[in-house]
């Protein structure tokens, strides 16, 4: 005997209200892989955390290297986050890293290998993100999300290097990045439950 739920759906607000943490800065997520994958992921994450929030003020701070150079530090630390807050007049900062490992190119035997060839590849990826309060330098929230997906437009170079440099990142990496971002940003978004 099957039971069918007929209860109505009720909206549950985000677990974290970002208006309580404004003004917010976001440092472009670090990524070991060269190319557009990490900046694309940062942009998608920013869009996702804003989606179900009221108007929130977010400042794009640039890359970690640029931010550290501006504040005179060599790594992100408690003191560095406090300096970021003072320099940019921010209450909280998002920082993260996109780790891509085990790139498995899909190369057919009919292709002749040449340096600079673009192929699709299956990759394992993990997105790690934290939100840090600048006054104390303490982490308020953190998460990680992992996925394995096939992506396109991976350039291969002599010596085994890979570059994620698609002209259209949404088409090439969208499935992977959307999964990682949706999973990592869930605490900032509306959810639904049945009553």
Locations of regions flagged by a protein language model:
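Sec-dependent bacterial lipoprotein signal peptides
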Residues: 1-5
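C-terminal/domain-edge helix-coil "capping" segments
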Residues: 6-20, 87-88, 100-103, 119-195
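Short, P/G- and charge-enriched loop/turn segments at secondary-structure junctions
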Residues: 81-84, 113-118
């Amino acid at each position: 005997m099957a039971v069918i739920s007929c209860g109505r759906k009720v909206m549950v607000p985000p677990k974290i209200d970002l208006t309580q943490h404004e003004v917010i800065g976001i440092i472009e997520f670090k990524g070991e892989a060269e190319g557009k994958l990490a900046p694309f992921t940062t942009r998608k994450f920013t869009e996702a955390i804003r989606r179900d929030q009221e108007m929130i003020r977010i400042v794009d701070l640039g890359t970690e290297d640029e931010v550290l150079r501006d504040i005179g530090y060599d790594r992100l630390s408690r003191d560095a986050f406090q300096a970021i807050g003072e320099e940019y007049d921010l209450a909280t900062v998002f920082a993260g890293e996109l780790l891509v490992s085990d790139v498995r190119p899909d190369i057919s035997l009919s292709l002749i290998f040449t340096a600079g060839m673009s192929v699709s590849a299956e990759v394992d990826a993990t997105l790690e993100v934290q939100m840090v309060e600048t006054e104390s330098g303490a982490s308020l929230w953190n998460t990680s999300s992992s996925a394995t997906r096939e992506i396109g437009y991976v350039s291969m170079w002599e010596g085994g290097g890979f570059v994620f440099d698609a002209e259209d990142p949404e088409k090439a990496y969208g499935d992977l990045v959307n999964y990682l971002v949706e999973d990592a940003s869930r605490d900032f978004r509306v959810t639904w439950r049945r009553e």
